Each structure stands twice: as C-alpha cells, then as structure tokens.
Regions:
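Stable alpha-helical elements in mature extracytoplasmic
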Residues: 13, 17, 40, 44, ...
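Short histidine/acidic/glycine/proline-rich micro-motifs that form metal-
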Residues: 5-10, 32-36, 74-76
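A phosphate-binding catalytic loop at a beta-strand-loop-alpha-helix junction
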Residues: 56-67
C-alpha cells in the first residue's frame, strides 16, 4: 500500500491505515504530499520499482495524486508515450491541471 494522504487531510487516519495493511500482511509506505516535488516523486518511483512491494495499491483522497504519479511511472519506468499515459492517468482520476503540469514537466526533465 502506498498512501499519498497527509495526516492533516480530512478523514485521513494514517495510523489506522498502516495497522490495517500490516494486519493482513501488506507493506505500508506513506509518502505524504499536497504539492508534488522531485523528492516525493523519486521516493514513489523507487517504491513502485521495488518488486518486493508488489502487487501495490496506491491511494490518496481523490485519485488526482495517484493519477499524476502513475503518469510519471508509466512514462519514466514503463516507456509509455505521454498521450497514452495521460489517458490512463485521467481514467484513474487525474483532473488537476496543476498536477498535470507538474507530471508533464517531470517527465520532460532528463
């Protein structure tokens, strides 16, 4: 489980989420962020690339952050073109123009 929610978000109970995941034998990785940055993105990419963390369930409050990070993963790690990756990210729930801009900018950076 990769959780992008911050402790201060309405309805977020990080400790309960961690306990629920570990009780059923799942790894729990908390990568909290409101506004994305390169550090958070690199942490996510490392976590998702680690095969010991798979299968993986990724969540946030609305799927916007998940969609943005998934877009980046698809382009950077899976070699997808940006149009295909964005279509999938939008299907997942990416609607925020700010997050789309960040994700597009990130994948264009060498």
């Amino acid at each position: 489980v990769i959780n992008f929610r911050t402790a201060g978000e309405e309805g977020a109970n990080i400790q309960a989420s961690r306990m629920a995941a570990t009780q059923v034998g799942l790894k729990y990785i908390h990568i909290p962020f409101g506004a994305p940055n390169a550090e958070v993105t690199e942490e996510f990419l490392a976590a998702i690339a680690d095969t010991t963390n798979q299968p993986v369930y990724i969540h946030c409050a609305s799927a916007n952050r998940v969609g943005a990070m998934w877009f980046i993963k698809r382009v950077k790690q899976d070699g997808w073109d940006t149009d295909r990756a964005m279509a999938e990210a939008e299907t997942i729930g990416l609607r925020s123009e700010r997050l789309k801009e960040f994700a597009r900018g990130y994948v264009e950076t060498p």
